[in-house]
Design a protein with these regions (language model features):
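C-terminal segment of classical bacterial N-terminal signal peptides
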Residues: 9, 13-30
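Periplasmic/extracellular electron-transfer cofactor-ligation site
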Residues: 33-75, 81, 85-86, 97-106, ...
Length: 130
């Protein structure tokens, strides 16, 4: 009887480990898909912004966690400069959703993304740019 329980427990443990590994694989795949989709969505942003420093808007490479309105070579709006923001996840999320509502008077003409999934994906892409 004890041998049967030990065997059953071993099988349950193996099944749990396999299940955990499959969840990790699905999670990694979802994260990669979000990043890829975020890069695709960024093409809208790339009309002005770049990751190479040659856009009409400021370069956004490494923007996550940085102070807003501090990139050299760009004339930011007084509205953005006066807010004293740091590009945290919450601030980026609000700005990407509706730039004019978050910083009235910003030079950003993009109206924003409505869907939470789109914002999540763009954030994943922005965080990857280092």
């Amino acid at each position: 009887m004890k041998a049967l329980r030990a065997t059953s427990l071993a099988r349950i443990g193996a099944a749990a480990a396999l299940f955990g590994a499959s969840l990790a694989a699905v999670s990694a795949t979802a994260s990669a898909a979000d990043l890829v989709r975020g890069e695709q969505l960024f093409h809208t942003c790339a009309a002005c912004h770049s990751v190479l420093g040659d856009g009409i808007g400021p370069d956004i490479t490494g923007i996550y966690g940085q102070p807003a309105a501090m990139r050299p070579g760009f004339n930011y709006s007084d509205a953005l400069k006066q807010r004293g923001l740091t590009w945290t996840e919450a601030n980026l999320r609000a700005f990407i959703h509706n730039p004019q509502a978050f910083v009235p008077g910003t030079l950003m003409s993009f109206p924003g993304y409505e869907r939470t999934a789109d914002i999540d994906d763009v954030l994943a892409y922005l965080k990857s740019l280092k």
